[in-house]
Structure formats: C-alpha cells, structure tokens
Amino acid sequence: QYFPVLSSGEEIATPVKKSQLPKSYITLDFSDKAMLKKFVQQLSSISDTIKSEIQTVQHTPSKATEDLLTITMTDGNKILVPLSEVAKKLPYYEKIKPQLTETSVVDMEAGIFSYRNS
C-alpha cells in the first residue's frame, strides 16, 4: 500500500494502489512521521532536476548519525546524507554525478566523498 504525502509533509491516511500513483513518484521509508515531514519540507528547496532523479529515501541511522538517510537515485547511485543537512548537501550531487564513472555511493555523512557501489 502507498500513502500519498503532501508538500507540507502530512501523510494522507487513505492508501492508494500502485496503479493510481503518478508516472513519477518518490518512495519514502520513514517510521518517524516528524522525520518524514522534515525531509519533505527540505526537499522543497532542492532543484527539480535532482528531485526527478530520486527513486527511494530510507531512514538508515548509523552509530555516528541518527538521522542518516540513504537516497537511491534512478541511475543506481546511492547518496548517504543526514536529514539535518539534506537542503545544504544534496545540491552538490549535480556537480558530483558527472565525475562518477560507475554506480557509486556518494557519502555526505561527514564531508563528501564517493566510492564504488559493490
């Protein structure tokens, strides 16, 4: 089941079928509704180019970063970025992407670097 999320970050309680989803959509996997809302609000400041390339967003906390997200892009690349820094760091993906020669993980948890996605 899919639950639509408004641009305000509010989740609609009525589920929709996959066949009812728009042509392009982002799958969001958050158990914490406050984090979901914060992500959606930060997403509003991200370019349409980057937004159109996002496939899924998952909350994947690490020992060092409780609010770490894993963002899977339509090209297969993955971006690791703290929720608190999405608006600040995610725009750098447009500059990094052309430099990637293979499917990669772009780690924005502390600084920004990339490595091959194994």
Language-model-derived ranges and their functions:
Residues 1, 55-63, 98:
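Short linear motifs in intrinsically disordered
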Residues 1-56:
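Extracytoplasmic segments of membrane-associated envelope/inner-membrane machinery
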Residues 2-4, 69-72:
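Short polybasic amphipathic segments
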Residues 11-15, 62-67:
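Short hydrophobic/aromatic-rich motifs at helix boundaries and adjacent loops
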Residues 24, 53-55, 65-69, 75-77, ...:
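Envelope-exposed proteins and targeting segments
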Residues 30, 61, 71-75, 83, ...:
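Flexible glycine-/small-residue-rich
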Residues 33, 64, 86-90:
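Alpha-helix N-cap/helix-start and coil->helix boundary motif
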Residues 77-118:
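Extracytoplasmic/luminal low-complexity segments enriched in Pro/Gly and acidic/polar residues
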